[in-house]
């Protein structure tokens, strides 16, 4: 695999901007965006579901459907309109979300009617390309490998924080899902707790190793009418299941086979 470089650039708000690429990034920065006021999201307890829900008032102020020439995720070029990445070019960039659902500035909220606590976590934005019109589907295998390396780097670094319990890289695709910027990008949420859906999956897996059951020849043949198995990379690494009762249309569940056997 080609060597990958990582540059850490300290922004004017004291946060780090990371540049990942096959070429070493030494470009001098241009004008930076004015530092934003720290937001303070918080968690509220939902008694009917017995789970924490995060609230962030700052989310209503996030950039929404700007003209292409004012895209905050494009490389900086117009000195009169700084962007999140103050460089003329980059391969992949990662930086803290200015309007996060979790952050280290979260404070306790005093409320006599509901149970609350700080929403201390980390939210990052991952910009896949400097090209405003790129999509993951159009990217080369080498660029996708770079993106996977970026996710892995951030996953390991974020999970090393003792306050972080779960790290989720994800991408919302389309305005129907709430996307307000069309530049190719995704996000990473580092949770201060394990989300209930994930916790349930862990409990189910620990109770019954269903992946091993499915991969057993006898069960595989009997389940053939219900499961379509697609091996990702190779059978010893991971497995993708198209289940008969998916949580979303066209959903695919990808499971690592590490520690399964």
Residue map of PLM features:
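HIT superfamily nucleotide-processing domains
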Residues: 1-261
């Amino acid at each position: 695999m080609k060597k990958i470089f990582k540059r850490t650039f300290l922004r004017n708000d004291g946060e780090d901007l990371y540049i990942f690429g096959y070429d070493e990034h030494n470009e001098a920065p241009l004008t930076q965006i004015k530092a934003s006021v720290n937001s303070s999201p918080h968690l509220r307890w939902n008694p009917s579901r017995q789970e924490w829900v995060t609230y962030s008032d700052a989310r209503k102020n996030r950039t929404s459907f700007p003209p292409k020439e004012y895209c905050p995720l494009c490389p900086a070029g117009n000195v009169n309109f700084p962007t999140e990445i103050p460089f003329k070019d980059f391969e992949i960039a990662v930086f803290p979300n200015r309007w996060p659902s979790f952050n280290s500035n979260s404070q306790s909220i005093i409320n006599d009617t509901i149970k609350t606590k700080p929403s201390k976590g980390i939210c990052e934005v991952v910009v896949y390309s400097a090209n405003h019109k790129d999509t993951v589907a159009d990217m080369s295998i080498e660029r996708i490998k770079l993106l996977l390396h970026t996710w892995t780097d951030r996953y390991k670094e974020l999970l090393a924080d003792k306050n972080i319990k779960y790290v989720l890289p994800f991408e919302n695709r389309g305005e129907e899902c709430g996307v307000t910027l069309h530049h190719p990008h995704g996000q990473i949420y580092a949770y201060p707790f394990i989300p209930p859906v994930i916790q349930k999956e862990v409990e189910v897996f620990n109770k019954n190793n269903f992946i091993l059951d499915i991969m057993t020849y006898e069960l595989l043949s009997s389940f053939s009418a219900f499961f379509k198995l697609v091996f990702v990379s190779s059978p010893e690494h991971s497995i993708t299941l198209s289940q008969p009762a998916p949580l979303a249309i066209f959903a695919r569940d990808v499971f690592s086979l590490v520690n399964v056997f």
